[in-house]
């Protein structure tokens, strides 16, 4: 463990972050992974407009010094930006871009695939580690307060998760595709690090559930969302294991590839909706469950929307999980229809086979971890999508354990796609380049959408039609930009390659 502090004043976090502000975040903050509990990644700020966004310039930049891409979304609380990468977190002064402190986790044998972000509570900041620990640090100095094991990394668990704080519950999930492990979500006391409850998406060890078909998996590796009125947390779950050998786990395999609604005080399941019953293609439904309160075809609804990795867009009533809409938003060829519950019906002819099957989407999916955004004014759900194909092989010699096969992507095209949530129709597409995109999406009330392309540009588009308004080459954008207001000026903050960049309009001359 190491902490490096700069000799500079520490901003206002000395007073600590008030967790009640997560219910209505201030405009000078982005205090949680999604910005607020809804997952919409939409800002009410309007200073940057389609008419002036071309004037954006660099206010400051920060370089991590690491030769790894940043996949985290920064958070901002009380004047401090927190940026993460595997084994690392930086505290950065939002006014200057200067490092306040850096914490480096000891070397470990965990899986260093990426990291999504941090969480704050009072005067602590929390991050997960590649060996499936969670650490509480003093938000002012970066010194360790406690360090707990979320799950056993020696069994094959790891974590990239940005924790979700709900009152005094710190909710955190893990990953683990390479072994037959149950999916877990834990609630941790942010003061002590003690476990409050554990939710299993598939049966825990030494138990059985006849509905599971023997499946394990269903890891909850992405940050969920929360409805304080319903007091429900919504989380997407990952694929079943063995991943490509469906014959070893007959049936639908609940609750893998699902959206689950959980009571944050008890950890009890309230309802579940399965986006990919009996998945055999590694299509997690871990993507962000976006919460929207609006009319749906003339009726006021509390909705949940998800663009899922399997290529389908879902609209649910989040009070009970009932399906309102299921439509494809990316190229798909693996289904034979939609069942009466609104779930895609897998076509057995598209299961992986020893001689290979050409499937769309490919393993990367119709989308992935990169966050979408919902723009309430236009009613558009905007998502970084991919139209792609892959060849899937089931390898009998691998048996019924872990991956149990292989897949090879053969074609893919990245595109930003705007979906009308009422009908599921695509309103516009914006070409992002070849392969799969890595950037998430941010929309603003003024009608600007921010994202990134595969060529290493951060983009500003007109939300109404997807037209390009501005771009800057900062390196590959690995998650969603954020925005905030400081001293009367609106900033856009985005991670590109291994750095962080703050953009702002020129100051008006007096």
Where does each model-flagged region fall?
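Aromatic (tryptophan-biased) beta-strands that constitute blades/sheets of beta-rich domains
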Residues: 15-64, 98-107, 143-152, 194-202, ...
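Loop/turn-rich, solvent-exposed surfaces of beta-rich toroidal or solenoidal domains
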Residues: 293, 385-387, 408-467
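Beta-propeller blade signature
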Residues: 137, 141, 183-194, 252-267, ...
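Structural recognition of the beta-propeller blade-terminating site
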Residues: 93, 138, 189, 263, ...
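Repeat-blade elements of multi-bladed beta-propeller folds
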Residues: 27-34, 67-88, 110-134, 158-182, ...
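Phosphate/diphosphate-binding loops
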Residues: 290-335, 353-362, 463, 497, ...
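Hydrophobic or amphipathic alpha-helical targeting/insertion segments
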Residues: 94, 117-150, 155-201, 318-323
């Amino acid at each position: 463990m190491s902490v490096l502090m700069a000799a500079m004043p520490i901003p206002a976090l000395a007073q600590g972050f008030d967790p009640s502000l997560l219910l209505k975040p201030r405009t000078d903050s982005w205090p949680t992974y999604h910005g607020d509990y809804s997952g919409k990644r939409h800002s009410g700020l309007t200073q940057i407009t389609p008419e002036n966004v071309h004037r954006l310039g660099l206010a400051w930049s920060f370089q991590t010094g690491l030769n790894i891409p940043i996949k985290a979304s920064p958070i901002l609380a009380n004047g401090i930006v927190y940026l993460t990468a595997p084994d690392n977190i930086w505290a950065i002064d939002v006014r200057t871009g200067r490092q306040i402190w850096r914490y480096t986790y000891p070397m470990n044998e965990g899986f260093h695939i990426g990291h999504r972000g941090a969480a704050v509570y009072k005067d602590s900041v929390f991050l997960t580690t590649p060996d499936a620990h969670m650490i509480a640090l003093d938000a002012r100095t970066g010194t360790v307060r406690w360090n707990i094991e979320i799950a056993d990394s020696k069994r094959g668990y790891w974590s990239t998760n940005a924790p979700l704080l709900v009152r005094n519950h710190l909710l955190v999930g893990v990953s683990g595709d390479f072994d037959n492990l149950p999916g877990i979500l834990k609630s941790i006391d942010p003061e002590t690090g003690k476990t409050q409850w554990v939710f299993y998406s598939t049966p825990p060890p030494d138990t059985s559930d006849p509905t599971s078909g023997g499946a394990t998996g269903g890891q909850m590796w992405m940050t969920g969302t929360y409805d304080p009125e319903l007091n429900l947390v919504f989380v997407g779950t990952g694929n079943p294991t063995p991943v490509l050998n469906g014959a070893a786990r007959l049936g639908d395999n609940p609750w893998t590839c699902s959206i689950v609604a959980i009571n944050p005080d008890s950890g009890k399941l309230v309802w579940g909706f399965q986006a990919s019953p009996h998945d055999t293609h590694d299509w997690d439904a871990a993507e962000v469950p976006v919460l929207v309160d609006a009319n749906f075809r003339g009726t006021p609804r509390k909705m949940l929307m998800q663009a899922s990795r399997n290529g389908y867009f879902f609209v649910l009533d989040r009070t009970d999980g009932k399906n309102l809409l299921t439509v494809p938003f990316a190229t798909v060829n693996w289904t034979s229809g939609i069942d009466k519950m609104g779930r895609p019906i897998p076509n057995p002819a598209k299961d992986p086979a020893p001689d290979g099957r050409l499937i769309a989407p490919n393993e990367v999916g119709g989308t992935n971890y990169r966050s979408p955004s919902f723009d309430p004014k236009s009613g558009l759900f905007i998502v970084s999508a991919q139209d792609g194909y892959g060849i899937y092989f089931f390898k009998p010699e691998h048996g019924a354990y872990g991956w149990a096969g292989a897949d090879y992507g053969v074609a893919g095209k990245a595109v930003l796609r705007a979906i009308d949530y009422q009908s599921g129709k695509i309103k516009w597409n914006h070409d992002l380049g070849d392969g799969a995109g890595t950037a998430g999406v941010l929309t603003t009330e003024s009608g600007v959408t921010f994202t990134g392309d595969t060529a290493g540009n951060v983009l500003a588009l007109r939300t109404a039609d997807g037209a390009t308004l501005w771009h800057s080459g900062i390196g590959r954008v690995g998650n969603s930009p954020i925005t905030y207001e400081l001293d009367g000026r609106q900033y856009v903050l985005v991670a590109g390659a291994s750095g962080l960049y703050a953009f702002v309009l020129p100051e008006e001359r007096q």
